[in-house]
């Protein structure tokens, strides 16, 4: 049985590492549209605890997860889990 790795995305929130396909900055217009489309379709998960959104994670199930942790920090956590 394979063990799924959990990655901390801030404030006690975790995501399965194998399900994440992208970590992006929320500042661009396409990412703002992605967030609004996900909200309208019920695919948005807000893990910011009311703080500013600093990164957007996209999963293989097309869910969009908002995090208040910088994309670089989250990618470092992925790299640590991978042993890179």
Curated annotation (Swiss-Prot):
Family, per entry: Belongs to the RemA family.
Protein name, per record: Putative regulatory protein Ddes_1405
InterPro entries: RemA-like
HAMAP family: RemA (MF_01503)
Matching Pfam families: RemA-like
NCBIfam families hit by this protein: PRK04323.1
